[in-house]
């Protein structure tokens, strides 16, 4: 049992061990199964890898075989290349041999040709020298022939003068003796031959005696007139001549007007003799500024005729002429007296008063484009047409009777005739579009004026919405009609001067830019036909067909409104060469009388040229060498023309734009181009022009050259115009240098001249001009804080006093030894009071206000004062007192109502217009005074003279 029990225990133990062993075997079998699976996976991976490697090995073997094949081919090609190289070396050696042979042959040929060329050059040089000698001899012969002809003409003229002088000597011996200065008033002669009698009848003798007119060229007219005035001047002031006063002064005015019309050069000797008389007359005119207009006007004419404007300041000169802006020769007076700077103010004043004819005279004389509405003179004529039409309605009424219509037509004809006269006298036809000039001629000839003005009026209305100047005119037109035009002066014909013989008016010709001519005749002439132009539709068809030519474009640009330039743009786009078309349209070179000489001529107006250039600039055309060459040649002649006369600033701007568009700016010096245009135009009219021309970098050098050459004041104007103040600091030092250098030079000339009064006066004048220019520059650029303007004004007064003493012969003492002593004293002198400076301030009356009149008076005063005073307003007879008197003296009251004045009878031909001047006048700013203005209306006066 124990054995069995032990045996069972062993069996149990064996079971447990077996179970454990079985469990361990089961666990091992599971891991073995996993290993078997992994092995199979590894075996399959290795099999695939081996297959891939075998394939790659096969590919490598195939590649190796192909490389071996290619290596064999390469060896074969290397052998072929070696063979080719050997053949090339052989051919190269052969080529070098042939090249050497060719060089030898070429050198031999070149030597041969060189010898032939040298022989030809020697022959050509010899021929040129012979030709040059022959040309010089021909020129010398031509010059001798010309000199001989001139001498023959001079001899013939001298002989004619001698014959004419001998023939007229006996006839005019009494007149010459009366006019001679050395005879004067001491000559014993009959009563009717006295100096007073001569002055009373001087206008008839000078104007109506044709024999005297033939004799004047053989004398010195300036000396004759001076002697005649000087001989009667003292007698005029000593005696109370009563009604003969006006006749004496009128005779002086007649002589001075004729002298100014002759445009003679006054000799220094005559000018020196006229200076004392000018000083004396100027003093009398200042003292009688308000009470004696004829004397004031005569003084202004005398100073202008003899070039004595430097005797006083510009302010005093302005007070002399400001009352006579409606005088026919007022622009010429401004030019002769050196008042060009004040012209813009005068024009603005006339425009405000709607004195369009007087405005037209100034604009044509000085070419003032920028003062026209919108910068276009054509707009001014359109406003003139409108004003003339309204004035005609005021004169003739709004009725439809035949008499009223005839009166309106006569008024329009007279205004148009006067406008054409002013344009022709100033040679300003190119300023205005041809269409408006033709319409003006139509109105003058009375060819259905209303129908003729319809196209112009429509064009004007289209431009009203875009032009500022027209906006102002619209504002003015809102004033009630009766209030604005109640004082129109009916002047239908120009007064005939006593010296002019009444003759039949011959047809005249107005030159228009298109090359055509419009005939003008007297007021009674009625033309049969009116020149017409192709219609706008026909012109457009020609443009669209691509057959635009220069004459067609020229006609189109003259007819085209300046704001509607679509047709012009299309015309330039249709042509294959816009630049060439522009040259043919706008300009040309005309041969002159001299051999090989040319003269530049504009075929269109400056405004039309500017319009075409703007369109051409937008197109940016490609300009070929032939066209550019033509442009260079035209530019050279154009610049010469502008350099001779720079009156048309718009033409200068067109020239500069022309250079930039055609790319020929480099053909001219930058300093020359910058100096063509006034400094004010660079920034105001065309601010981007300098950049367009590429002249920005040249501006500092240009200004520096102006300073080096002594034009310092002008340099300062350019400094401010181009904004170069930061590069030329301080500006005040430049002004001080200018004054210092001018003063030193003048003092040196004064000392060296010793007792030569003419040279001393010239030195003083030079210093006075420098001081006035400096004062103007300081005021313009607001530099008053850096200078004492009062000291500069005192220096000018002291210099003028020294000048008077020198002219009178009393400046040879201490003044001549120390010319600057007067200036040093003036710097410490007490400043003048307001009353003392009144003659050069704003209390001098302005010209009569004729606000609605469209025609200007040809004479600034009346010969018959007594008759004119019958209708004067109350207060006219007040004593003058001091010039700076109360302003009420200039505005006397009256008791006439508007309706009463409108009922006064009007003679459309012989009426004058007078008014009272403006006491609030400012020398620096022209403008109308605030408050009411009073006028004399339609006084019956002698048409030859007008009473103020």
From Swiss-Prot:
Q: Where is the composition biased (Low complexity)?
A: 807-817
Q: Which residues form a coiled coil?
A: 47-164
Q: Where is the composition biased (Basic residues)?
A: 861-872
Q: Does the keyword Coiled coil apply?
A: yes
Bias kind Basic and acidic residues: ranges:
459-475, 518-527
Question: Where are the annotated segments for Disordered?
Answer: 447-500, 518-538, 804-894
Tissue expression per record: Expressed at low levels during seed development.
* Keyword terms of this UniProt record: Coiled coil, Developmental protein, Differentiation, Flowering
| Pfam families per UniProt | Frigida (PF07899)
Query: Which InterPro entries does the protein's record reference?
Result: Frigida
Whether Lipid biosynthesis counts among this entry's keywords is no
Compositionally skewed regions (Polar residues) per UniProt: 818-830, 873-894
Origin: domain of life: Eukaryota
> What are the recorded Gene Ontology BP terms?
cell differentiation; flower development
Family to which this protein belongs:
Belongs to the Frigida family.
PANTHER family under this entry? FRIGIDA-LIKE PROTEIN 3-RELATED, FRIGIDA-LIKE PROTEIN 5
Protein's UniProt name: FRIGIDA-like protein 5
Q: What does UniProt list as this organism's lineage?
A: Eukaryota, Viridiplantae, Streptophyta, Embryophyta, Tracheophyta
